[in-house]
Amino acid sequence: MDHRLLEIIACPVCHGKLIFDKENSELICKIDHLAYPVRDNIPVLLENEARELSLEEEK
């Protein structure tokens, strides 16, 4: 994922910063505890596409 893109996109729920999880190909919002999928190098920033992070994943 392009680091320049990460600088301009934000969580659609809280507008907070997103962190790219390369291993799982997801964008993580630590504030809302949500993971947004990245498909074919395109972030899917739809709340209904996000999954909630488990307690173990948040560490």
Swiss-Prot record:
<dbReference type="InterPro" id="IPR005651">
    <property type="entry name" value="Trm112-like"/>
</dbReference>
<comment type="similarity">
    <text>Belongs to the UPF0434 family.</text>
</comment>
<protein>
    <recommendedName>
        <fullName>UPF0434 protein PMI0721</fullName>
    </recommendedName>
</protein>
<dbReference type="GO" id="GO:0005829">
    <property type="term" value="C:cytosol"/>
</dbReference>
<dbReference type="Pfam" id="PF03966">
    <property type="entry name" value="Trm112p"/>
</dbReference>
